């Protein structure tokens, strides 16, 4: 359904979302799995002098990762709880796009251990929540 404003023009901010079958996105050519992360970090180090590794927590589909990339960071790990967000992130970015629940201490410890195997991390960023998708913990 298309909504019109008071003067009869289409209001683009009131379009009704259409949900259809999901689309499978191919992973980025430089994407890796969580257990492959230290090897991916070593590969980036071999190709770039002094890379600035970053981690994007609560990444969503990758808006903050894009900004970090444009600021010359290499986002080696992005984490989000939503599968569709992670699939979109994995399609657009190299590194590891990891679907996980960061409210679980065990998960956070596993991530910390894996990052310790990667060497120096320059930045850990946490994206602001998208309120309609956030849940109360």
Predicted regions and their residues:
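Conserved active-site and SAM-binding loop architecture
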Residues: 1-137
